[in-house]
Amino acid sequence: MKDRTYIAIDLKSFYASVECRERGLDPLDTNLVVADESRTDKTICLAVTPSLKSYGISGRGRLFEVKQRVKEANAGRQHDAPRRRLDGTSHFFSELQVNPSLAIDFIIAPPRMAYYMEYSTRIYQVYLKYIAPEDIVVYSIDEVFMDVTDYLKTYNLTPRELAMKIILDVLETTGITATAGIGTNLFLCKVAMDIVAKHITADKNGVRIAELDETKFRRELWSHQPLTDFWRVGRGIAKKLEQNGMFTMGDVALCSERNEDLLYKLFGKNAELLIDHAWGWEPTTIKAIKAYRPSSNSLSSGQVLHCPYESQKAKLVVREMTDLLVLDLVDKGLVTDQMVLTVGYDIENLTDPARRAKYHGAVEKDPYGREVPKQAHGSINLDNHTSSTRKIMCAVSELFDRIVDKNLLVRRMYVVANHVLPEADAPKKNDGVVQLDLFTDYAAEEEKQKAENAALERERKIQAATLAIKKKYGKNAILKAMNLEEGATAKDRNAQIGGHKA
């Protein structure tokens, strides 16, 4: 089989870089953070410029953490400043480097998701100047994989030269720089970008490019820590490995040779992927990714509330989410026969002594390691595949009442339409043989079915009209009464993309 060459490209601090360019500022010399300050200081920062990161600030921290770290850094600068006094501020890294009397300042830019998507589209058009779309996989808004195997000879370039040519074109077109990883498979190019490139010096344009093959991976990264730096190794997997004496990918590779059964016992079939990656192997190609079709599909909607909600207000939000999810089904020509609901409770249920005294149920830890009541989770089957708002809304409301503890405060919820398929492929209700009996009034049943079909047809026309108006005049052009109730969130979320300001 022909050896392949892959390039992964990650746009550097993408959201923050866009905000800098739009202000006429250099992303490599400006202290800027993208965060929605209107959501309080606990809001998550979507991006931080490299210069601000140099003060020990995480790229995905919370705004109050950024402010605290800058305050600490300024305290250190004041201690070292002439006369122990700071005489001004600057958000430019270069000015701060040459003038120790300046305090560190930074710009807080509210997110503009629609604008970032426009930038991402422009950058993708640059990629298409060099690589065909069938050889590109868009991994996220700021990251892509490319199979460049068949392009190196065409351009008479090495992989590094081609990567640099593409990145410099992006820089010239948009003013945004990038990091690249080159590898003999998708895993190695990703790891080269995520781990190796971070430890090399950037060139004058802020570009970093790193290369890996299987041999170099084993030589340089078998001893790398922490394990969570590696693609697809989360905290849970790393914790299990460490509990069993494996702290590096080299340890995992050694275990796969000496005691492979242990890995399968710990991770089941997922151990195969972990073992492959420990050796620097990855058989999946971009061609295989493009050809993949999932055996089952779903559509989902999730939401984390800005503050804890009582159950009735939370139910209102779930109903809003369900309503929009059904419209999404209709828009895509899809139907579902099962709804799944997950509701996560707030930490206040256990930190408030009065509420804690009333709760005697199971407890689990949230992603931050804090104890919270165990989340509610359940599913409900529909009579047949449908995209009826009325039917699905009733089912989800019934499911909410069945699984949610009415005495607990809710913080997050996820609604999923399961077993989704195109309406044309859906099996018809009562398709096939029907068992007859002497006690059923089939004439009345037939009339009832006709009335039901007519109601569904009317509902479908209303859904189609609603979608047409929303597409033409905006998502908030039509609102339901429930969207105006206290605690409703749909109106605000309609002005967002991915939960952030559009």
Task: Indicate residue ranges for each PLM-predicted region.
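Gly/Gly-Pro- and Ser/Thr-rich, intrinsically disordered tail segments characteristic of DNA damage-repair
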Residues: M1-D276, E282-I286, E445-A502
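DNA-contacting surface of Y-family translesion DNA polymerases
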Residues: A8, A103, D229, K239-V410
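Short, charged/polar surface micro-motifs in flexible loops or helix N-caps
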Residues: K12-F14, S38-K42, Y345-L350, V420-A424
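Acidic, metal-coordinating catalytic segment for phosphate/diphosphate chemistry
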Residues: V18, G369-A502
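Composition- and surface-driven signal marking solvent-exposed, interaction-prone regions
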Residues: D80, D337, A354-A357, K428-N430, ...
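A glycine-rich phosphate-binding loop feature that marks nucleotide/adenosyl-phosphate handling sites
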Residues: T184-F187, D276-W279, V335-I347, L409-P422, ...
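Short, well-ordered secondary-structure micro-motifs
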Residues: V191-A192, T351-A354, D425-K428
